[in-house]
């Protein structure tokens, strides 16, 4: 029966099963946390960026559609699809607050959080399906599409980020789909894929300016496809495809700009916003000469195709066609060596004695003051390597290594389809290398959110590796292939249980427990509030929290962060409980030192180590009893 199952039926059944797991894992937690900056998006039910965007459309206040410099419009659109339907009369669900002390309505906030998050979560589930379908159109390999969907649906980090009301939540999904749609275009030459890629790229740029990296990657795709896919064609065919690739690239750019401007009309009123959200993205000052060079090459190449009938370019590509395998081998070696170097550096402590910096320091002096390429590289690659499930990491490396060896990939794939797979591996590897190069150029230490575009790239490479490995098994023994797939999926799914329900804090077991690459960022606040809510007279208690995530779920009164210094002139003896976390204590170090000295009991009454890592903690203290 399994042998008779067609690829289409298999993909359909597999998709719904994986989608069911994705929904079952993620939906129950949507209303049980608040993370960094979400209060700026929707936590206040009468204002915030989501409300600002939808109100701007309602009142035709077009300038107000620019809600943030990210710009986060895609996030606001998806979050606002269900949130405002729930917030019919938000003011009726608030308690009285003042500048310092707030009182929340936990039941309301929990339900509102669910509605503001579910649109993003469902959209990303649909986009994972689209990614799987595009991979099927590109490779015609049902197993590859299945493994890709599985690794994406079962990724703790991607599930976690999809639960957030944050621009990064939609960056990875729209960006990956846009890239694959353009790959489908250069492979099949159908304009509908270019149109789809342009629309998706527009949504990517509306998510976050980091999506501008796709300008460079799609540019590379347009040219590299001529080498990897079309170098052996006739000169006339090569010329036709070359012109189509360039025009398709320009169409994608124009459509992305049109989508950007139409969904953020502020860009039509002030074109500066259009520039800053696309080509003039943050840090673009260093890339202006590169953009000019890219434009010059594009114009020169198009002129050669039109006026010289591709005599030079076809001859050059035909001569360079033997570089395809060396290029992929080079990328495979760079990535494999990078992963091995990262594992050697950190999996058994700081083996090489590198200088360290907090993973969330970004452009902080703790990182920028570090000298030495290898030290910086070890810090840059650490989050990606140690927050990727081991099964995915292993098969991603296997994908690049097996794909780089012609004899091995020919055994698993037909000649026609192996060219598409090799090209995909080249692009995915190029994205990773280009991303880290840009991070070095920007002097910024990337963490999980900053590098979110890389996780689907690694997952797709892992799917290629799994498909290549599976095709080495005898085709007549269907049970062996299904057994291999089941074991691999079970291994991957175990990662979901590791840090559940705090999926965005997932860290694999390759990193020692006393080390961290992620922070709570509001996780654990709900659990701390649930603990205090069960204590006697909690509704009359006053608590202080050093970070987001606690106050909205606490039944009593609450003070957050540094604002406590304004409470009764710095007299803290009325505060009953204190909620502390790693990130919060860094931000409120001096205040916490004063609180510990004056009023806080030395031992916590409740502790949560997220992922079993003591460095990623949430603790609750009570006030010290007077002597």
Regions found by a protein language model. Give the residues of each.
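Transmembrane signal-anchor helices characteristic of membrane glycosylation enzymes that use polyprenol
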Residues: 10-42, 47-48, 57-64, 150, ...
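Catalytic lumenal/periplasmic loop and adjoining terminal transmembrane helix
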Residues: 26-32, 75-76, 255-260, 265-284, ...
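Hydrophobic, aromatic-rich transmembrane alpha-helices
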Residues: 130-132, 295-331, 335, 339, ...
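Membrane-interface transmembrane helices that cradle and orient dolichyl/undecaprenyl
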Residues: 137-139, 178-194, 204, 226-229
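Interfacial juxtamembrane loops and adjacent helix segments
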Residues: 40-121, 349-371, 514-515
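Transmembrane-helix motifs of polytopic, lipid-linked glycan transferases
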Residues: 114, 118-139, 177, 181
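Signature aromatic-anchored transmembrane alpha helix within multi-pass, membrane-resident enzymes
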Residues: 9-19, 219, 253, 325-335, ...
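Hydrophobic/aromatic-rich transmembrane helices and adjacent perimembrane loops
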Residues: 161, 168-171, 204, 213, ...
């Amino acid at each position: 029966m399994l042998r008779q199952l067609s690829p289409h039926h298999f993909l359909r059944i597999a998709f719904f099963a994986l989608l069911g797991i994705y929904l079952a894992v993620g939906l129950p937690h949507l209303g049980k946390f608040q993370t960094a900056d979400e209060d700026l998006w929707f936590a206040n039910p009468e204002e915030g960026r989501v409300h600002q965007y939808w109100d701007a459309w309602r009142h035709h206040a077009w300038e107000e559609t620019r809600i943030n410099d990210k710009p986060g419009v895609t996030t606001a659109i998806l979050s606002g699809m269900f949130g405002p339907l729930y917030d019919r009369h938000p003011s009726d669900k608030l308690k009285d607050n003042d500048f310092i002390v707030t009182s929340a309505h936990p039941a309301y906030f929990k339900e509102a959080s669910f509605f503001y998050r579910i649109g993003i979560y469902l959209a990303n589930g649909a986009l994972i399906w689209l990614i799987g379908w595009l991979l099927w159109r590109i490779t015609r390999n049902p197993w590859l599409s299945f493994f890709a969907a599985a690794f994406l649906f079962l990724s703790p980090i991607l599930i976690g980020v999809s639960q957030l009301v944050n621009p990064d939540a939609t960056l990875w999904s729209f960006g990956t789909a846009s890239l694959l749609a353009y790959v489908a275009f250069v492979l099949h030459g159908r304009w509908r894929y270019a149109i789809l890629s342009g629309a998706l790229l527009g949504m990517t740029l509306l998510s976050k300016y980091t999506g501008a990296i796709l300008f460079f990657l799609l540019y590379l795709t347009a040219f590299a496809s001529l080498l990897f896919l079309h170098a052996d064609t006739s000169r006339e065919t090569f010329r036709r495809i070359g012109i189509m690739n360039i025009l398709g690239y320009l169409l994608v750019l124009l459509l992305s700009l049109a989508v950007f401007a139409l969904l953020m009309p502020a860009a039509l009123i002030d074109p500066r916003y259009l520039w800053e959200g696309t080509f003039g993205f943050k840090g673009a000052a260093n890339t202006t000469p590169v953009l000019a060079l890219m434009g010059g090459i594009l114009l020169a190449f198009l002129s050669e195709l039109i006026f010289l009938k591709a005599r030079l370019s076809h001859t050059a590509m035909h001569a360079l066609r033997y570089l395809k395998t060396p290029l992929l081998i080079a990328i495979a070696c760079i990535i494999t060596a990078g992963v091995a170097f990262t594992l050697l550096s950190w999996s058994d402590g700081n083996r090489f004695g590198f200088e360290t910096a907090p993973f969330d320091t970004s452009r902080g002096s703790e990182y920028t003051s570090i000298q030495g390429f290898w030290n910086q590289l070890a810090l840059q690659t650490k989050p990606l390597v140690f927050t990727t499930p081991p099964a995915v990491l292993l098969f991603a490396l296997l994908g690049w290594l097996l794909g780089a060896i012609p004899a091995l990939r020919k055994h698993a794939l037909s000649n026609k389809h192996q060219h598409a797979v090799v090209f995909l591996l080249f692009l995915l590897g190029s994205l990773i290398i280009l991303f880290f190069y840009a991070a070095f150029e920007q002097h910024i230490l990337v963490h999980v959110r900053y590098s979110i575009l890389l996780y689907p790239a690694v997952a797709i490479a892992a799917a290629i590796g799994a498909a290549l490995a599976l095709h080495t098994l005898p085709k007549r023994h269907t049970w062996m292939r299904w057994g291999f797939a089941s074991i691999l999926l079970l291994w991957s799914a175990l990662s979901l249980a590791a840090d559940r329900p705090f999926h965005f804090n997932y860290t694999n077991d390759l990193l020692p427990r006393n080390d961290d690459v992620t922070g709570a960022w509001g996780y654990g606040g709900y659990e701390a509030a649930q603990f205090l809510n069960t204590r006697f007279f909690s509704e009359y208690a006053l608590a202080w929290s050093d970070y987001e995530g606690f106050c909205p779920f606490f039944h009593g009164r609450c003070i957050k962060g540094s604002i406590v210094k304004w409470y009764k002139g710095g007299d803290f003896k009325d505060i009953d409980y204190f909620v502390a976390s790693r990130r919060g204590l860094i931000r409120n170090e001096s205040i916490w030192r004063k609180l510990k000295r004056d009023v806080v009991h030395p031992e916590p009454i409740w502790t949560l180590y997220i992922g079993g890592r003591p460095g990623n903690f949430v603790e609750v203290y009570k006030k010290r009893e007077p002597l």
